[in-house]
Amino acid sequence: MTAWRVVFMGTPDFATGTLQALLDGPDTVVAVFTQPDKPVGRGMKMQKTPVKQLAEQHGIPVYQPNRLREAEAVTALRALRPDVVVVVAYGQILSREVLEIPTHGCINVHASLLPRWRGAAPIQRAILAGDAQSGVTIMAMEEGLDTGPMYSTVVQSIDNHTTGGQLHDQLMAAGGGLLVETLARIKHEGLTPQIQPEQGVTYAAKLKKEEGLVDWSQPAIQIQRAVQAFDPWPCAFTLWQGKPLKLFAASVVVGHGTPGEVIEVEKDGFVVACGDGALRVAQVQAAGKKRMSSGEWLRGHGVKQGERLGEG
């Protein structure tokens, strides 16, 4: 069967996994749409999106409209005559006009087992909620937010130590392979999508940096999940001597004390009392420092038993 003309729409690192899988597959990526370059860092230097960088490495034309709804962008997309548009974390809403351009529609790679965790931050929300599994869903796009019928899914387990970064990488790898396999099944088997269940719908709100601030009055298990989910961004953090202290690699332990109180200092970690139970912290990152083991940090700074974290 003739290779399909694919237009890819995506922006962050997560989307590069699917783009690379398409480039390695049997279809032809004729163009990429991604968000405009943005100034970053102290020097405000313009930075290309990860998807743009990968596309340019392969000589693929790149389009970066401020709004995909603009007439110029719609005209450009129509001129590409796509058989299918593949969308992965693009960051823009696709209008009905855009959705109707490709012959076989627009297909989305979403990092959750829909209908659970529709929305912007499904990876972190799944860990925060204590879900035992996540996954990737390939769906046909419609105007609603992640509401389209589903072609296929793949499941990824989440354990007590899975971080947001680890789950991101696992789903990024799984999503690319599943998308290529699904496109082949649509072409060769006439695979049709199934309507999403009406039960079990949840929404994954966009992450905000301030969500990382630890509330020590919460149960230890909830704080541990936040430490996992927010690694590597936005990072769970507390205040120590009035400065931010990022927390990593935490585990729930038995312990009692005033929430935020350091109740035990060990050679390779420290234990903080929570609203219910306690949290052992194995890695930290102090302001202006690199990430390090808690043992290394303790040798240099010496947080004392009885000190309170979270106080400005």
UniProtKB/Swiss-Prot annotation:
Attaches a formyl group to the free amino group of methionyl-tRNA(fMet). The formyl group appears to play a dual role in the initiator identity of N-formylmethionyl-tRNA by promoting its recognition by IF2 and preventing the misappropriation of this tRNA by the elongation apparatus. SUPFAM superfamilies: FMT C-terminal domain-like, Formyltransferase. Keywords: Protein biosynthesis, Transferase. Its EC number is 2.1.2.9. (6S)-5,6,7,8-tetrahydrofolate binds at S112, L113, L114, P115. This is Methionyl-tRNA formyltransferase. It catalyses: L-methionyl-tRNA(fMet) + (6R)-10-formyltetrahydrofolate = N-formyl-L-methionyl-tRNA(fMet) + (6S)-5,6,7,8-tetrahydrofolate + H(+). GO terms for molecular function: methionyl-tRNA formyltransferase activity. Belongs to the Fmt family. InterPro entries: Fmt, Formyl_trans_C, Formyl_trans_C_sf, Formyl_transf_N, Formyl_transf_N_sf, Formyl_transferase-like_C_sf, Met-tRNA-FMT_C, Met-tRNA-FMT_N. It is an enzyme of class 2 (transferase). One of its GO terms (cellular component) is cytosol. It comes from Magnetococcus marinus (strain ATCC BAA-1437 / JCM 17883 / MC-1).
